[in-house]
């Protein structure tokens, strides 16, 4: 790997790390009743800083998919397809596992007051598949990765932009004709999810599952845009030309998305076409900014914190999910009764010391720091030593 490529990948790791840290922070406030406006999602139409973190990660996944598939020369083979399928299934299964683990812990706690045997309680807690959420963040990542990888190996890359446009335009037509911009159960997205998945297996938000089946269509287009940006990153050698193209793509996509939002609202929960376009544009511009800071100016000492998140992003995200479930379900004595460890830390320590909103933010930051410390330890043990680096040259 040449020097330019190495630096370019460092900037990508940092952006990935920033998004993972952001996802962990906004998903784990001390109290959902006390969240600063920029750290909350838009209720329906609109865009907040928090709405950027997940689509940024999807965008980065598209770039990484291009990089990882180069070893196959983008030619379809049974071995490549098998590896893609295996990775897709594993990521999807991990997402289901997280959903099951959360349901197991909640069910176990809800049965604590009932006079039933240990094994009966255990059995009821384990068997929660009749109302487990099927889709989610990890599942969306899996489906979009699998679809993008197969497209990359079976379609000429010069045709991918046309596929992206077809997916986004087709999805917009679906939204227009299917009441898709309404925030209720008459929305075509809700209708399809209830018919295919069943209401018991959906996220509860006015009938809308933000990671539902139909909204996976524009999400695939989203990752494909990242794939095309990855192609640019790896093929353009001159750093100034690379930055110029990234900023140009980012500016055009952002301007186009906001312009089209007058007829197609920007909406994360339905992953509207304009949401995909705008967030990919902002992601491209942000990546260009990081490359300029890290590669051109050489300011990279600050990035070590985010590198810990960016090198093993899925591991950190899953670990954060498990820790969040444990904090929310481990019971401890508090004020004459019992409460979750999460609630105890916030209500018993941070809220009295700092207040409602600052205490809630402090909890989120401390949780990020906890996950960073684990990620940093993993980075230390997985990074090659200076001696190993010398021997590999």
Where do the language-model regions lie?
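Long hydrophobic alpha-helical segments that form multi-pass transmembrane helix bundles
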Residues: 157-221
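Conserved small/polar residues in nucleotide/adenosyl-binding loops
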Residues: 381-388
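N-terminal signal-anchor module of multipass membrane proteins
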Residues: 2-73
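Transmembrane alpha-helical segments and their boundary/interface "anchor" motifs
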Residues: 51-54, 71-99, 103-148, 152-171, ...
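Extracytosolic (periplasmic/ER-lumenal) interhelical loops and adjacent juxtamembrane/interface segments
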Residues: 34-43, 115-124, 181-208, 336-356
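Functional transmembrane helices that form membrane-embedded active or gating regions
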Residues: 5-14, 19, 243-255, 273, ...
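Membrane-interface transmembrane-helix boundary segments in multi-pass integral membrane proteins
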Residues: 47, 209-219, 268-279, 284, ...
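Specific transmembrane alpha-helix
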Residues: 54-70, 141-150, 214-235, 253-259, ...
